[in-house]
């Protein structure tokens, strides 16, 4: 399997390319811990200039990494939030075979491990988890399993349903039985943003992982079924955000899942005409402001 050493990171200014914050680099640090699969998990940390008023953990989506959330990070820091962003196993600067996982729930277990580090470094601080796309599914799985790990949850464009033909699913399950680590390039992941500059940066990102293994594809289908079956365990406060023109996940699936969540404090915000990555789309100021306002009302005020 490929490890973190197989990628040319030294020549790549990872934390400055995506984090456009003007805060001093002394407030940014990088570290690793060992995952439940015994591979190194890379994460980044940003601290505000002033006192910490809360913590936001970022859980990234498929193929990407925790360094692509600079637009969100630069809005959180002035509000007094410390930010921790993980790279899941098999993605970004973490170890493991690219695009592979033995059990999808391992992602949630790794976020739980990072949460332990966060709690030790920021004792007594309220914690929120922000998950996008596949990271939204991971966050829902995490919230259902470890509801006490966070004080509130933000889920953007969660991958709660996949559109696959029965024949394709059968073929994937067959390949998974014979050769689970077989890698295949995914068909187009859809257009993430209406901003051509964001699309260009995404497509040129040397850390982007365009492949998934048969095991991974079977595991995400299993996880989607499990998370939907356990929807009653989804705790609040919870904020969901969805662009109506998203062509990566299914907007109607987000609505359907949200309506089944029993939490009293739950909010669904939709953005007309927005694509998949609300935080990187044209007009991103609106969803970013909504996220900040929602967090402040529950974690600070």
Predicted regions and their residues:
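Short beta-strand/loop motif that positions the catalytic acidic residue
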Residues: 234, 240-242, 246
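Catalytic nucleophile-loop/oxyanion-hole region of alpha/beta-hydrolase
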Residues: 63-65, 92-122
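N-terminal cap/lid segment of alpha/beta-hydrolase-fold proteins
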Residues: 23-48
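Alpha/beta-hydrolase fold nucleophile elbow
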Residues: 122-132
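Conserved alpha/beta-hydrolase
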Residues: 73-96
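Short alpha-helix in the alpha/beta-hydrolase fold that links the catalytic acid
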Residues: 236, 250-259
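Alpha/beta-hydrolase-fold enzymes
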Residues: 132-213
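Catalytic active-site module of serine/aspartate enzymes centered on a nucleophile-bearing elbow/loop
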Residues: 272-301
